[in-house]
């Protein structure tokens, strides 16, 4: 279920402060965050945000199409290595 419009989008305050500082300085370095639950706001467009996936920080370049989605959607947490082939099926 989506969040109520009355409440507005959720974003962690520490992440919002980092984004405001990066936007003021026009800093090209990625903004590191562990907050996968924060929503992408229009102020983030054009910034690179390094989202933690449980093991490392994945750089995500924010575009206009991503506004309204959560940061965690763009940094996968699981690696898919494919299904193991059965020896009998190869014959």
From Swiss-Prot:
The keyword rRNA-binding applies. Protein S19 forms a complex with S13 that binds strongly to the 16S ribosomal RNA. Gene3D superfamilies: 30s Ribosomal Protein S19, Chain A. Keywords: Ribonucleoprotein, Ribosomal protein, RNA-binding, rRNA-binding. The keyword RNA-binding applies. This is Small ribosomal subunit protein uS19. GO terms for biological process: ribosomal small subunit assembly; translation. One of its GO terms (cellular component) is small ribosomal subunit. The lineage of its organism: Bacteria, Pseudomonadati, Pseudomonadota, Gammaproteobacteria, Pseudomonadales.
């Amino acid at each position: 279920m989506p969040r109520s419009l009355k409440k507005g989008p959720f974003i962690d305050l520490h992440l919002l402060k980092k984004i405001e500082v990066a936007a003021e300085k026009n800093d090209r370095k990625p903004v590191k965050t562990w907050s996968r639950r924060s929503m992408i706001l229009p102020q983030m467009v054009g910034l690179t945000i390094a989202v933690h996936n449980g093991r490392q920080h994945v750089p995500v370049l924010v575009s206009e199409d991503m506004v309204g989605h959560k940061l965690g959607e763009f940094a996968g947490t699981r690696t898919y290595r494919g299904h193991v082939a059965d020896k009998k099926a190869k014959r």
